[in-house]
Amino acid sequence: MKLLHGLALVFLLAAASCKADEEITCEENEPFTCSNTDILSSKNFGKDFIFGVASSAYQIEGGRGRGVNVWDGFSHRYPEKSGSDLKNGDTSCESYTRWKKDVEIMGELNATGYRFSFAWSRIVPKGKVSRGVDQAGLDYYHNLIDALLEKNITPFVTLFHWDLPQTLQDEYEGFLDRQIIQDFKDYADLCFKEFGGKVKNWITINQLYTVPTRGYALGTDAPGRCSPKVDTKQRCYGGNSSTEPYIVAHNQLLAHAAIVDLYRTNYAFQNGKIGPVMITRWFLPYDESDPACIEAAERMNQFFHGWYMEPLTKGRYPDIMRQIVGSRLPNFTEAEAELVAGSYDFLGLNYYVTQYAKPKPNPYPSETHTALMDAGVDLTFNNSRGEYPGPVFAEDANSYYYPKGIYYVMDYFKTKYNNPLIYITENGISTPGSESRCEAIADYKRINYLCSHLCFLRKVIREKGVNIRGYFAWALGDNYEFCKGFTVRFGLSYVNWDDLDDRNLKESGKWYQRFINGTAKNPVKQDFLRSSLSSQSQKKRLAC
């Protein structure tokens, strides 16, 4: 009888557990109560799922001890483009000398992974390995990696996070020339030899889409090339916004594939994995009842995601791109197509926001045309009814976020690209850099962003079977933000720009810590954040 009673109790507990699991709901919009956090924790993602944080070299290291890169050149030449505060990455978090504090904070978070990048010009100051390697740069990364491994934090290393050595840009315009393939390959070969015994997860290029579009179509990012009439203030040092983005993207894919082939051919014995990182967005029809808007959203998917994913899976560009772009779109030779197709063990996907899509005439050819116009799509953050997809993402950019977008993007990649192994390599939100220390630390907006996206991430894994193995919050700490300087903060830890040794977990960092530990609790509710309490009263309640 006791045995039967015991079995019945076990059954009831199991049933209750399953029921609780099935009843997980995710809020799509404010208020994000995150009421499901008692069952939404790291424990619900599997014991081998990696939860970490991310950063990049130019944004955190500072310029000490390395060669000049294109962001140095760009930010000094066009300071107004590098941030409205006219700041740059010359001095940022100074992680080059304060990396021990970074590792200490990751240990405090109980993070199990850290995605960071090598500064190419810190290891190879003049761009080409044949011109010399800086031992101090190698030692810096060895020390960092060793410290991570001591704390059981898995390193994910990005080889190129947009900071190309300036010498290669000066000599042959960087990714505009195929010479970059060999130089990138030589640099990667050095890194595999030097660090491959410790690093088992390699990323070739961060956000393949970004450098071609922002660096060569709009000129808003390094190296700052565009057609003369695209930047009316004449702040591009040359370029063709209609053709160069496609050439740069093509050479990036060829360089990526060459490096993956090198790793698989010469370093398979290291038992690691390698892949690229994509920036992703979800595109909703501006008017869901209008077939033209539905078609525009899918066309945008092809120009935004398919531009890289079709070559990486099939060895060719999307049919719609070949049809619209025509001769401006390079072709792969048969050998190149074979090399590019399948050149990844995993995909890193960065996700931040969702936008609405509606058709817009493509003005090509014209003096103000850019490759971004070829899709013939106008992107907005409001739909035909004037509705926004979710809460404010960045006040200065009038942008909004949509947590369920991460669900749709992951399902899209699973369905369209044969359910690849995926890591979420960036996901986060900015807060104003003008906030006081107390306001910056009490970042409940970031908690709501993180927990709402993690909820939908778990939901898509469970409901759709998407093969996601890790999540990296952006960012480890406040840092220099490309094109915004220090006017925004993305960190889970606070950095005092007047005293760089002053670094502490924000409320979001403490929440993420509890989430990783499996003890996450509800964040402070939105109604408190919007309450009529005076600023002093709020500070007192928050113990600032």
UniProtKB/Swiss-Prot annotation:
Signal peptide start and end residues: 1-20
Tissue specificity of this protein: In vacuoles called myrosin grains of a certain class of cells, myrosin cells, distributed in the cotyledons and the axis of the embryo as well as in different organs of the growing plant.
Example of a GO biological process term: carbohydrate metabolic process
Disulfide bond entries: C26-C455, C34-C451, C226-C236
GO molecular function: beta-glucosidase activity; metal ion binding; thioglucosidase activity
EC numbers on record: 3.2.1.147
Location of this chain's protein in the cell: Vacuole
Binding site for substrate: Q59, H161, N206, E426, E481
UniProt cross-references to PROSITE patterns, sorted A to Z: GLYCOSYL_HYDROL_F1_1, GLYCOSYL_HYDROL_F1_2
Enzyme class: hydrolase
Keyword field contains Plastid: no
Reaction(s) the record says it catalyses: a thioglucoside + H2O = a sugar + a thiol
Binding-site residues for Zn(2+), renumbered to this chain: H76, D90
Residues carrying sugar: N110, N240, N331, N382, N517
This protein's UniProt keywords: Disulfide bond, Glycoprotein, Glycosidase, Hydrolase, Metal-binding, Signal, Vacuole, Zinc
Reported cofactor(s): L-ascorbate
Residue numbers binding L-ascorbate: Q207, R281
Matching Pfam families: Glyco_hydro_1 (PF00232)
Active site, renumbered: E426
Cofactor note: Binds 1 ascorbate molecule per subunit.
Stated family: Belongs to the glycosyl hydrolase 1 family.
Additional free-text comment from the UniProt record: It seems that the absence of a catalytic proton donor in plant myrosinases is not impairing the hydrolysis of glucosinolates.
Assembly: Homodimer.
Role of this protein: Degradation of glucosinolates (glucose residue linked by a thioglucoside bound to an amino acid derivative) to glucose, sulfate and any of the products: thiocyanates, isothiocyanates, nitriles, epithionitriles or oxazolidine-2-thiones.
Protein name: Myrosinase MB3
Native organism: Sinapis alba (White mustard)
